[in-house]
Amino acid sequence: MIIAVDVDGGDYAPKEIIKGALKAAQEYKIGLILLGKKEVIHVHAGHYLKKLPIEIVHCPQTVTFNEHAVEAIKGKPQSAIVIGTSLVKQGKADAFISAGNTGAVLAAAFFILGKIEGVERPALGAIITTRPHIPSLLIDAGANAECRPNHLDEFAHLGNIYAKQVLGLENPRIGLLNNGEEEAKGTKLTLETYQLLKKSKLNFIGNIEGHDISLNKADVIVTDGFTGNIVLKTLEGLGDALLKVRKVGHAIDSAAHLRGRALLADVGLGSMVKGMDFEECGGACLLGVKGTIIVAHGRSHARAIKNAIGLAKRTAEKGVDKLIAEDIKSRTKAGTEGDPKNVNTPV
């Protein structure tokens, strides 16, 4: 298993990215391809380069966060994002992860890897944990701001496969994020999506509301990328706030007359806080392209990068992209639900 890592992307690059990658190589027993400035990688990786199965690919160009995604990909072919994605395309890497410009990573995946046949809108699937040790998948977490009903139906099928393979769920519960549980509530988008999901063979449980996310009512939470990204960032912000409370300790102490650590252990808050920490999962997987691409958070530290690499490893080992392709073919052949002819309706 070889994972390509962009060491140029992220607020704390390259030091934290390289640090996390080295930890991943040791813990997961995998090979790495580090993409970035060769001399910089040597400075931060040091003697580990001789001890671990690591290859360095020099990338003289860097895509910054404020660059236009498509222009950056076309104008900087020697950037880590372009080269890393190309390595996956060529079969020289099993997966690629980046904490850099998300739009550029998505654009590179679309143009270089291409979409799986039958998929119109690849989507970001983000694993979230609001209850201790009970993960769920939020899709789309930010790839598609504007969607049509058939897109959300497509996201549900992508998420269903990912939840089965990576989360280990036998029959994932699919919930449509809405402003009410009733079938007749919502926008034109959610109303029409509801009917598509209702007709599908998925384990569709109906609409779920925002508060249902923390109750783990659904295993796969389906929504458009605009809403999904707001939900994700809100949960991340809450997680950050709880982490700060946990670190301070005396804030809980004064309210409960207990040592903060004791209270956390008693009510299981520590496990919940850990689960809501975005660094615990590491990143979101781009589902629907021909390969494994993990988008890490821009403010990832070493732990997040290590966990993102672990997620990439699990995803690639399961062959999720190939299973998605097989699922589309089987549904098309059956002539029942999710026919790509219906999915590829012009926007």
UniProtKB/Swiss-Prot annotation:
Pathway: Lipid metabolism; phospholipid metabolism. Keywords: Cytoplasm, Lipid biosynthesis, Lipid metabolism, Phospholipid biosynthesis, Phospholipid metabolism, Transferase. It comes from the Bacteria. Pfam families: FA_synthesis (PF02504). One of its GO terms (molecular function) is phosphate:acyl-[acyl carrier protein] acyltransferase activity. One of its GO terms (cellular component) is cytoplasm. The keyword Lipid metabolism applies. GO terms for biological process: fatty acid biosynthetic process; phospholipid biosynthetic process. It is found in: Cytoplasm. Its main location: cytoplasm. Its EC number is 2.3.1.274. It catalyses: a fatty acyl-[ACP] + phosphate = an acyl phosphate + holo-[ACP]. Belongs to the PlsX family. Homodimer. Probably interacts with PlsY. Catalyzes the reversible formation of acyl-phosphate (acyl-PO(4)) from acyl-[acyl-carrier-protein] (acyl-ACP). This enzyme utilizes acyl-ACP as fatty acyl donor, but not acyl-CoA. This is Phosphate acyltransferase. It comes from Dehalococcoides mccartyi (strain CBDB1).
